[in-house]
Amino acid sequence: MAEPSVKKSKLTESDWISGLADDLLLQILSKVPTRESVFTSRMSKRWRNLWRHVPALDLDSSKFPHESDLEDFFDSFLQFDGNLKIERFKWIYNVEEHCDPEFVSRIDHVVKRGLKDLTILSKVNIEDDSVRMPVSLYSCATLVNLTLYSVVFDAPRAQLVSLPCLKTMHLEAVKFDGETILGTLISSCSFLDELTIITHDHDELGDVSVRSPSLRRFKLESMREDYDECEDPNVEVDTPGLEYMSITDYQSESFIIHNISPCAKVNIDVVFDAEDEDSVIHDFITAISTVRELTISARTLEMIHDYVESETELVPQFSNLFCLHASFSESSWEMFPTFLGCCPNLHSLFLEFDCLPEKEEINLSLVPHCFESSLEYVQLKVPITVSETSSKMELAIYFVRNCSVLKKLMLNESFGNVINKVRKIPKRSEGCKIAMPKPLHENVSHGSSLLPLICGFIPKILDQ
């Protein structure tokens, strides 16, 4: 029997797509930038106006030759179907002449169209023409996800602030015309699940007050370049349900944590610059001592090291700590046995050193309690430039000979010249394996088309 011709047996990509129902096509088109959605109008008569019914707008000002073209397109899209809900709206906004009343009016129209997902990324560099948000955004009853960059919030009337469905909020370089607006905004979100705040120079953020019983994830990062002129805002956190908190490159006078879940994972990179610095450090360490998983930066540990030395204070017990990721600098590396001594139930340990001293300067006589009872996994990372073979051996010996329940010691490539010697060290734990990670290979994808995009979205849509 003759084989069917390729032309008859194999549907083209456009034929296969066109066989889908309109509702499914609209959901697929809502996942791509509007510019690409418009291009589908050329495929066939059926597709000519399909993009006009997509419940999403994804715009980039730089893709339009003239600013007036973008404005005309925006207005015509909304006017074509006055009842169309705009569930997702994204605008990369970069114009030379910003007209605030017209911009606010357009965003206001979108907010009132049943909006669920809003992203505004402003790249306007005109100080006098701040990109402001409409007051209606404060009371958008349908909004679920909010992402804003370099925009301004005007002070609202308190009774207008209500975002009952908002679950994720990402604010970067956002200015507030009032020091209490951010706190009011956060507390108005009854179901807020994830909050990200990234501060920039001159954003006039005021204090960061995060009070939310529903919040599970909180990320705070500083992009400020000159701490001498403008420190990061003070922070106050009261989030009993918080499961993850990340503080990156932060420096403030005060960081108060009233309440945090004992199951929380915390990533800390913060230092303090306050008159009563010792009290601030003590309260902060005590507040995070209840968490289950902790990642702590070298400069934060250096601050703690200086505090302990100057005040002859003891680091509080981290009795609940199960997993620790810690980075040590040259000036504070020797405190790591002492710090581990405060973690009696530690199970997994990841240590990173920016250097190692000479063997004669190493004193690892203190054996923490967790070495005897709970520590099962250790990973050591030393820069490849560190050449002190004897120092690396001392570090490895410290764990191999003292950890009675250790199951695995992972060493990075810097230990390549001593790995065989380390494996011959008599082990306190007979079942301990000593290994080095294999190099990672990047996955490279080739080519792209609309078909794999659609195939990826269909299962997700059908599951909804």
From Swiss-Prot:
The lineage of its organism: Eukaryota, Viridiplantae, Streptophyta, Embryophyta, Tracheophyta. It comes from the Eukaryota. This is F-box/FBD/LRR-repeat protein At1g80470. CDD domains: F-box_AtFBL13-like. InterPro entries: F-box-like_dom_sf, F-box_AtFBL13-like, F-box_dom, FBD, FBL13/AtMIF1-like, LRR_dom_sf, LRR_FXL15/At3g58940/PEG3-like. Residues 15-62 form the F-box domain. The keyword Repeat applies. Residues 359-413 form the FBD domain. LRR repeats lie at residues 96-122, 123-150, 152-178, 197-222, 223-249, 273-298. The keyword Repeat applies. Keywords: Leucine-rich repeat, Repeat. PANTHER family: F-BOX/RNI SUPERFAMILY PROTEIN-RELATED, PROTEIN WITH RNI-LIKE_FBD-LIKE DOMAIN. SUPFAM superfamilies: F-box domain, RNI-like. Pfam families: F-box (PF00646), FBD (PF08387), LRR_At5g56370 (PF24758).
